[in-house]
């Protein structure tokens, strides 16, 4: 794994970005640098890519087994779920509600590969990973004999086609919050476009414009048309706490992601996976509280069970009991009362003052590509940059 700099900018880079809907490429970081640059990339070997792909497939299979066990046992003590959320989880799992995609976040130092978390509900940077970095790979000059771990787009097409065949439905609604930024809507537009090319009739709307028809007992759009299939770039834990949430039970609407993914998008997963698979090579020791930690010399990352963009992350030193805010993490009262886990700190490599995190994508049940984000700190937050990758044999 190497960080390559000095790659020439494509003469028509801006035009290429805009043509694929990546109009937030120049979103600024705090230092004024842009979210995307043609000039930097990460180089991997084929052996490293094989390792990442194999780990992703193995961890996803472990997570699916984990969901099955959790539902079978019905032990949701650590999650702080409502009764309705428990019912939604169990109903969606019993009905084999299909899923679309997810993204593992990995730390990798060229030798050790460790799972940080599974963004199984509302992962973004999909457009960047599936389309933008592939376009870059095909057009950039000066990188001979390169390839990329990336067939995300093809797997999405296959998945949307399969969903249509299985459901027998024709229409698919795609929704996000009205006030969501261009990154969210850019990712949503991309998914809607893929679904359209797979044969679906597409409808876009804001989450706030979803209604419920008491007479037909169906979720409907602004035209009072039934919503049969809904992809929502809106967290399940939020949606399942709205006034319409009780209507999700026994609803004719198929939600993406399904409610059983509440078990994977919550960081309870990390502690329970470690308990179930102690010393697994791709897992970091993770516990629910400080008292369970036995490795006194390690630094531990205190993460909220529900949190996004590196919010509310702390470091804890077992040897002296000190706890302090992690550099690069912003505090949000929204996540302050969500509960926490303690995950052993993994030392990310420092390349020219930047810390990369690998996002490895799963579509359906298939590992199919990756993208990287790097930040000025070991906590990946709103200042991060998306960096393309390639590999050489």
Task: Give each language-model segment a name.
Residues 1-393:
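Preference for protein termini
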């Amino acid at each position: 794994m190497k960080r390559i700099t000095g790659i020439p900018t494509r003469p028509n880079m801006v035009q290429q970005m805009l043509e694929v809907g990546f109009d937030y490429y120049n979103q600024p970081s705090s230092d004024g640098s842009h979210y995307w640059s043609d000039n930097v990339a990460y180089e991997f070997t084929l052996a490293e890519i094989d390792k990442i792909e194999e780990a992703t497939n193995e961890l996803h299979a472990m997570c699916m087994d984990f969901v099955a066990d959790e539902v079978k046992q019905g032990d949701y003590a650590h999650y702080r779920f409502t009764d309705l959320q428990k019912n939604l989880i169990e109903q969606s799992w019993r009905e084999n509600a299909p899923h679309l995609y997810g993204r593992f976040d990995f730390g990798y130092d060229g030798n050790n590969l460790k799972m940080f978390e599974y963004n199984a509900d509302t992962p973004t940077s999909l457009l960047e990973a599936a389309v933008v970095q592939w376009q870059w790979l095909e057009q950039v000059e000066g990188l001979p004999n390169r390839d990329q771990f990336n067939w995300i787009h093809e797997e999405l097409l296959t998945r949307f086609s399969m969903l249509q065949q299985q459901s027998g439905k024709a229409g698919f609604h795609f929704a996000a919050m009205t006030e969501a930024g261009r990154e969210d809507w850019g990712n949503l537009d991309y998914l809607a476009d893929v679904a359209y090319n797979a044969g679906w009739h597409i409808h876009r709307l804001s989450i706030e414009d979803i209604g419920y028809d008491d007479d037909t007992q169906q979720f409907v759009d602004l035209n009072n048309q039934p919503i049969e299939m809904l992809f929502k770039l809106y967290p399940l834990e939020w949606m399942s706490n709205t006034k319409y949430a009780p209507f999700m039970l026994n609803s004719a609407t198929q939600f993406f992601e399904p409610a059983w993914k509440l078990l994977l998008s919550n960081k309870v997963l990390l502690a329970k996976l470690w308990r179930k698979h102690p010393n697994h090579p791709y897992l970091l020791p993770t516990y629910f509280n400080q008292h369970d930690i036995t490795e006194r010399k390690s630094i531990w990352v205190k993460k909220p069970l529900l949190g996004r963009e590196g919010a509310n992350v702390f470091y804890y030193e077992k040897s002296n009991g000190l706890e302090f805010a992690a550099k690069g993490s912003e505090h949000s009262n929204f996540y302050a009362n969500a509960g926490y886990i303690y995950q052993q700190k993994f030392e990310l490599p420092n390349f020219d003052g930047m810390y990369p995190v690998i996002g490895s994508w799963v579509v359906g049940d298939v590992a199919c590509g990756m993208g990287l984000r790097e930040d000025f700190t070991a906590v990946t937050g709103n200042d991060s940059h998306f960096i393309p990758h390639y590999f050489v044999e």
